[in-house]
From Swiss-Prot:
Keywords: Amino-acid biosynthesis, Histidine biosynthesis, Hydrolase, Methionine biosynthesis, Multifunctional enzyme, NADP, One-carbon metabolism, Oxidoreductase, Purine biosynthesis. It comes from Rhodopseudomonas palustris (strain HaA2). NADP(+) binds at G166, R167, S168, S191, I232. NCBIfam families: PRK14186.1, PRK14188.1. One of its GO terms (biological process) is methionine biosynthetic process. This is Bifunctional protein FolD. Catalyzes the oxidation of 5,10-methylenetetrahydrofolate to 5,10-methenyltetrahydrofolate and then the hydrolysis of 5,10-methenyltetrahydrofolate to 10-formyltetrahydrofolate. Homodimer. The gene is folD. Pathway: One-carbon metabolism; tetrahydrofolate interconversion. Gene3D superfamilies: Leucine Dehydrogenase, chain A, domain 1, NAD(P)-binding Rossmann-like Domain. GO terms for molecular function: methenyltetrahydrofolate cyclohydrolase activity; methylenetetrahydrofolate dehydrogenase (NADP+) activity.
Length: 295
């Protein structure tokens, strides 16, 4: 058996098209243009790439895009003052501070300062608490993308056995909550879990988010299971050429056992920015008291 490839390029393009249609409708019906503000501190090359991609895709969806660039040595008070201005700006419905921040800045204080209604990264403790309580919340983008990809394979996740490998605040913990909201039966595994391969072999859905190259081996996978690989790891090429990107799952082994699997690259990573656009439209609708959009 060779697994069906869950193509992030196709799914994210379809999602962005649906977002653009919702933006057009909201503009026409209510005269509102959803706006996303991205704050970049310093000049980390990887962050620069992400910010450019977000700016381009935001504009392509018909939304307003605001970029704020600050030097790496910006005082914490100045960064917090900018966030305060964005919180008060009616043209801004979503605020994203590109992480990680340079040394010397308190990321937790910055996240706490973002208005939860505009927290499109879903990291503010208020949104985390609302998600855990089953209330409407802006959800971290990568876990949201994982659920969308899993539901491309399974119309319903209800009753399925799922394992989430990794317990970060950014991916693992919110993903567990989203799976519970879908009525899946969830195991959360981590570095202290005993006999991780055996736990994986019981799962219909495997979500790998540990940041360890190809840790999940093919023989850990239950035949026919759906595998969502969140990992993006840069590893040296065996022939000494350019580094290659691999996931947390040993793809070459797993694809012959799984029923469906996401590739790396070309999988979950492409969904993250698309889900950021989803969150911005949802935030704009909620702020203006509009019904939840159809994305």
């Amino acid at each position: 058996m060779t697994a069906t490839i869950i193509d992030g390029k196709i799914i994210s393009a379809e999602l962005r098209a649906r977002v653009a249609a919702e933006v057009t409708r909201i503009k026409a019906d209510h005269g509102i243009t959803p706006g996303l503000a991205v704050v970049l501190v310093g000049s980390d090359p990887a962050s620069e790439v992400y910010v450019r991609s977000k700016h381009k895709q935001t504009q392509e969806a018909g939304m307003a895009s605001f970029e704020h660039r600050l030097p790496a040595d910006v005082p914490q008070a100045e960064l917090l003052a900018l966030i305060g201005q964005l919180n008060a700006d009616p043209a801004v419905h979503g605020i994203l501070v590109q992480l990680p921040l340079p040394k010397g800045l308190d990321s937790n204080a910055v996240i706490d300062a973002i208005d939860p209604a505009k927290d499109v990264d879903g990291l503010n403790p208020v949104n985390a608490g609302r998600l855990a309580s089953g209330l409407f919340a802006l959800t971290p983008c990568t876990p949201l993308g994982c659920i969308i990809m899993a539901k491309q394979v399974h119309a319903s996740l209800e009753g399925m056995n799922a394992i989430v490998i990794g317990r970060s605040n950014l991916v693992g913990k919110p993903l567990v909550q989203l799976l519970l909201n879908e009525n899946a039966t969830v195991t959360i595994a981590h570095s202290r879990s005993r006999d991780l391969p055996a736990l994986c072999r019981q799962a219909d859905l495997v979500f790998a988010a540990v940041g360890r190259p190809e840790m999940v081996k093919g023989d850990w996978i239950k035949p026919g299971a759906t595998v969502i690989d969140v990992g993006i790891n840069r590893t040296p090429s065996p022939d000494g050429g350019k580094d290659k990107l691999v996931g947390d799952v040993a793809f070459a082994e797993a694809k012959d056992i799984a029923g469906a699997i996401t590739p790396v690259p070309g999988g979950v990573g492409l969904m993250t920015v698309a889900c950021l656009l989803v969150n911005t439209v949802r935030a704009a609708s909620a702020i203006h008291g509009l019904p939840k959009p159809a994305v």
